[in-house]
């Protein structure tokens, strides 16, 4: 498959880098959270509140199955998508997985800097919860094809494109 799949913690820059990568590579962008919101005609926050997290994770799994037929896409995943149901292995079948690694301290700065009311798992800017989430997820994220330290936006873009082309044999 010739897709790039961006994974990482909430606030790691998946959506922002995804938009730029799609322009550079001339690939369509698929944001899995946005796709779910469109399918459900509800925000992620509303879906969690009305139906619960399990329902949301089922929707993510359905999207993964649909994406298996796609190519030439940049796919920006929700932070939890690779974690549940061993989805990381399915994502690796879909395309070149890139873990956007951001130090915990930087994630906390980003969270505190901006109120993230739309992210149900980051409500109330709970730094302890973010720290626990980070510790629980990092091992799975590191199963990606490559790891990019995403603290410098332009360098991250260049490195992702270069590494992806090498992976493709270009």
Curated annotation (Swiss-Prot):
GO terms for molecular function: ATP binding; magnesium ion binding; shikimate kinase activity. The keyword tRNA-binding does not apply. Pathway: Metabolic intermediate biosynthesis; chorismate biosynthesis; chorismate from D-erythrose 4-phosphate and phosphoenolpyruvate: step 5/7. It catalyses: shikimate + ATP = 3-phosphoshikimate + ADP + H(+). Its cofactor is Mg(2+). SUPFAM superfamilies: P-loop containing nucleoside triphosphate hydrolases (SSF52540). The keyword Iron-sulfur does not apply. InterPro entries: P-loop_NTPase, Shikimate/glucono_kinase, Shikimate_kinase/TSH1. Keywords: Amino-acid biosynthesis, Aromatic amino acid biosynthesis, ATP-binding, Cytoplasm, Kinase, Magnesium, Metal-binding, Nucleotide-binding, Transferase. Disulfide bonds: none annotated. Binds 1 Mg(2+) ion per subunit. GO terms for biological process: amino acid biosynthetic process; aromatic amino acid family biosynthetic process; chorismate biosynthetic process. Substrate binds at residues 33, 57, 79, 137. Mg(2+) binds at residue 15. ATP binds at residues 11-16, 119. It is found in: Cytoplasm. Its EC number is 2.7.1.71. GO terms for cellular component: cytosol. It holds the Pfam family SKI. Monomer. PANTHER family: SHIKIMATE KINASE, SHIKIMATE KINASE 1, CHLOROPLASTIC. Catalyzes the specific phosphorylation of the 3-hydroxyl group of shikimic acid using ATP as a cosubstrate. Belongs to the shikimate kinase family. This is Shikimate kinase. It comes from Clostridium botulinum (strain Kyoto / Type A2). The gene is aroK.
